[in-house]
Regions:
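Mid-domain alpha/beta scaffold segments of enzyme catalytic cores
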Residues: 1-282
Length: 282
C-alpha cells in the first residue's frame, strides 16, 4: 500500500528501546511518508522531530506549542519556532489549537497562544495542524477570523467532531485526519463521519504512540498500524484499504505541494510553501 502517516510522535521515550525497528516496521507495512510532530514544553523539544526528518528521507517534521503547554509559552518559544520554520523539512506548524477536555492551560491563554502561532504560520507560509477537543465553536471561530484568508489550509488532526464541524473546516481549506480511535467499537459516530466526508478531504494517521487501533488496543501504537485506520475507513466506504491509502496519500501531497516521488525521496516541498526569500536563508 501507498501509505502516509500524517501524524506521529516518533521522538518520544516510548520508542527509545526499538525506534529503528519501529521505523523499519512502518516501511515494511507500506508507510512511504511520515509527518513527525514536535511539541514542547521545553524550548529544545519544539524541534524534537527535526533530527528524524533530517536523518530519514521519508520523514518530514512539524513543530508547534500544544494547547496543553500554552501556559509555558514565552517569546523564546516563539523565536525558536520561527527558526525551525526556516528548515527545509519543517513543512507544517503544529500541533496547535484548543483543548477544553483537560484544560491543562487556561482557556484564554490557549486562545492567545493559538492566535500567535497562526500569525507565525501565516508569515512562514506553513499549513497548520489543529488539535481541537471539546472546543469546536471557539476553534472554528478563531480559524475563520485568523486563518481562512491565508489560503494555506491544514489538518484537523485526530478528528473527533461532527460532520458539520468537519465540513466547516473543509470550507476553510482543511483536510480531516482520522486516527486509531476510529476503529473502536463505540466510535460509530466517527466512522459515520469518515463515511460521509468527501474522499479527497480525508487523511489517516496513528498519533503514535497514542490511540492504538482496536487490534492493538491497550498497547503502544506505532506508524505501521496506520493500515488498520485505512482498513476501517475502507470498510465504511465499501472501498479497498489500498484505495483509501492511495487517495489519502495524494491528499497529503496536494496539501504540502509535494509529488509522489518527493514523498519517497524526502525532497523539499514545492515553492508555494517556501518563498524565495526564505529559501535564501535555509
Amino acid at each position: 500500500m501507498d501509505l502516509i502517516d500524517s501524524h506521529a510522535h516518533v521522538d518520544v521515550s516510548d520508542f527509545d528501546a526499538d525506534r529503528e525497528a519501529m521505523l523499519g516496521r512502518a516501511q515494511a507495512a507500506g508507510v512511504g511518508t511520515l509527518l513527525a510532530i514536535g511539541n514542547g514544553p521545553e524550548i529544545e523539544k519544539l524541534g524534537a522531530a527535526v533530527p528524524y526528518a533530517e536523518r530519514y528521507e521519508w520523514i518530514y517534521a512539524a513543530a508547534g506549542i500544544h494547547p496543553h503547554e500554552a501556559r509555558h509559552a514565552t517569546e523564546a518559544h516563539y523565536a525558536e519556532l520561527d527558526r525551525l520554520a526556516r528548515l527545509p523539512k519543517l513543512i507544517a506548524w503544529g500541533e496547535i489549537g484548543l483543548d477544553y477536555h483537560y484544560d491543562h492551560s487556561p482557556r484564554d491563554v490557549q486562545a492567545s497562544v493559538f492566535h500567535h502561532q497562526l500569525d507565525q504560520a501565516r508569515a512562514a507560509k506553513r499549513p497548520v495542524i489543529i488539535h481541537c477537543r471539546e472546543a469546536w465553536p471557539d476553534c472554528l471561530r478563531i480559524l475563520d477570523e485568523a486563518w481562512r484568508s491565508s489560503g494555506l489550509g491544514g489538518i484537523f488532526h485526530c478528528f473527533t467532531g461532527t460532520e458539520g464541524e468537519a465540513l466547516s473546516g473543509i470550507d476553510m481549506g482543511f483536510l480531516v485526519s482520522f486516527a486509531g480511535n476510529v476503529t473502536y467499537p463505540k466510535a460509530q459516530n466517527l466512522r459515520d463521519v469518515a463515511g460521509l466526508l468527501p474522499l479527497d478531504k480525508l487523511l489517516i494517521e496513528t498519533d503514535s504512540p497514542f490511540l492504538a487501533p482496536q487490534p492493538h488496543r491497550g498497547r503502544r501504537n506505532e506508524p505501521a498500524y496506520v493500515t488498520e485506520v485505512a482498513r476501517t475507513i475502507g470498510n465504511v466506504r465499501n472501498l479497498p484499504a489500498e484505495e483509501i491509502a492511495g487517495v489519502t496519500a495524494e491528499n497529503f501531497r496536494r496539501l504540502f505541494g509535494i509529488s509522489h516521488s518527493r514523498t519517497r525521496s524526502g525532497a523539499v516541498p514545492e515553492e508555494h510553501h517556501l518563498t524565495s526569500d526564505r529559501e535564501g536563508n535555509l
